[in-house]
Amino acid sequence: MRTCLVGSEMCIRDSFDEAARLGVGFCLGYAELTPDGHRYNTYVLVDKTGAIVGKYRKVHIPGHADDEPHRPFQHLERRYFEESPDGFEVVNAFGGIVGMAICNDRRWPETYRVLGLQGVELVLIGYNTPMHYAPDPDQNPLQSFHNNLVMASGAYQNGTWVVGVAKGGIEEGVESLSHSQIIAPSGQVVAQATVSGDVLISARCDLDLCRHYKETLFNFDVYRRPEAYRIITEQKGVAPPSG
């Protein structure tokens, strides 16, 4: 494949050309180096003409910055990437309101709520999750459960479709979760990968279904109480009561 540089972004030109030929869109994740030297874990949204219509930089950076010899493998994302200063934004694309998130972002409810407050109807998430979690291996058997839990909850509580696309299989001895999913605004999984190799899953995503939840149980304008949630943005870590 030929590669090219578009500003500070490296793209695989043939993928863009093929998207335009087929009339389909896609997301592409890459390591971004900005002209002023910042490094981000970045995602672009490409429409059916092959044009970039959205860009997102990862907010929640997991892992560690220094080598930890006791680990069977290193998770050095915090060494190589900075936290995004941009937050979560949506774009109008594919006839709806689309938001993006990357990997660890999917575990945080704030991700979906910030997008939900902008009317998101389709959240696109790419993730690469090892089956082994070194800080607490007792969570290993729960990886699939937790993966579904966070994306289904985010979909339901914000009345949006969620498409989670996973990297599966074994690379350099590390097994990844896989389990790509398409989740409806009801929180129901309507399509899921059941193998760890390359596989295509699909579903018809009726964006009008989002209104069933956005205009009823999760009508934010009627039921949300921002004044009761101030601690969420005013405080970062846990602060137990004294005494």
List where the protein language model places each region.
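Short, basic/aromatic recognition patches
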Residues: 16, 22-35, 152, 158, ...
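C-terminal beta-strand edge segments of enzyme domains
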Residues: 153-154, 160-243
